[in-house]
């Protein structure tokens, strides 16, 4: 086992306690269908479940958002993003929130990408049974989930990258992506980022063929769909977000970028503020921006 893995796990245990307290203090939005714990791989693993949310009484096909939760690649589950996803569903979307196996032990980064592609593929095949407009599918991810979003978009567009991970085009064409306070570069000198690399890639991380995927600058292309990116005054990944902005400028990729400088209760907005508290004024502002950005990319024709 990597020497720092137990330390990282202890840190995430503390985060789990804080998340549990946060979730217990929040009231779930009402008026929404909540189909929970759908297996996208039938192996009995909690890591291979997803949830689907959409407004009750829906009579037409809705644009789709697929959400990938964050948690430093080693922590998290779809439930920590539940209220965020429900608030997006309130804005007129069908939202699918996915689990994936967490890094550590024998589980590596490529296993996680494989899981996410399995979830995408399941959605592409099965959303026809739900009020989903498969012509208008969007992707969202926060923190490590933002990194996963960048990587999976790149892989979905590139057959050689698909071969690296042993996956195929998933059947979904993402019209736009929301990267919320995303991790972007784990390789440049930065202890907070670098400490994760051996957990994700194993002992041979320096020679791993997956190493390049830990720096979005090595996989980004002009084919990327439009992105919404946000950060905040108290976001510890702010510099990473600005790096992504610079990459989009370099590659002429359409994007909307918002660095939130607002304060709430006299304090700076923190990392993934609109995910952990989608009920706050700033959280709702950011999530409304995401919804509006996605709606601006909606195509008229629907897939059956």
Task: Indicate residue ranges for each PLM-predicted region.
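Alpha/beta-hydrolase superfamily serine-hydrolase fold, recognizing
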Residues: 1-304
């Amino acid at each position: 086992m990597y020497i720092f893995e137990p330390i990282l796990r202890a840190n995430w245990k503390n985060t789990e306690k804080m998340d549990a307290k946060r979730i217990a203090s929040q009231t779930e939005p009402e008026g929404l269908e909540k189909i929970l714990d759908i297996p996208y791989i039938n192996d009995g693993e909690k890591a291979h479940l997803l949830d689907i949310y959409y407004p009750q009484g829906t009579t037409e096909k809705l644009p789709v958002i697929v959400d990938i939760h964050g948690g430093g690649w080693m922590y998290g589950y779809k439930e920590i993003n539940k209220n965020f996803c429900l608030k997006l569903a309130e804005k007129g979307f069908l939202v699918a929130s996915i689990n994936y196996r967490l890094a550590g032990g024998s589980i590596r980064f490529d296993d996680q990408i494989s899981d996410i592609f399995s979830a995408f593929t399941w959605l592409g095949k099965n959303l026809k049974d739900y009020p989903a407009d498969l012509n208008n599918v969007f992707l969202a991810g926060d923190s490590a989930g933002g990194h996963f979003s960048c990587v999976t978009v790149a892989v979905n567009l590139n057959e050689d990258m698909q071969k690296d991970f042993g996956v195929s085009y998933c059947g979904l064409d993402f019209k736009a992506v929301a990267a919320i306070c995303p991790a972007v570069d784990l390789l440049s000198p930065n202890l907070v980022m670098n400490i994760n690399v051996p957990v994700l890639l194993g002992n041979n991380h320096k020679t791993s063929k997956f190493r390049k995927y830990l720096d979005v600058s090595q996989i980004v292309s002009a084919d990327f769909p439009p992105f919404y990116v946000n950060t905040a005054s108290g976001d510890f990944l702010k510099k990473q977000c600005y790096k992504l902005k610079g990459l989009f400028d370099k590659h002429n990729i359409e994007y909307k970028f918002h660095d939130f400088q607002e304060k709430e209760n006299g304090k700076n907005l923190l990392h993934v503020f609109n995910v952990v508290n989608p009920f706050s004024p700033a959280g709702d502002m950011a999530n409304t921006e995401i919804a509006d950005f996605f709606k601006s990319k909606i195509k008229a024709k629907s897939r059956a």
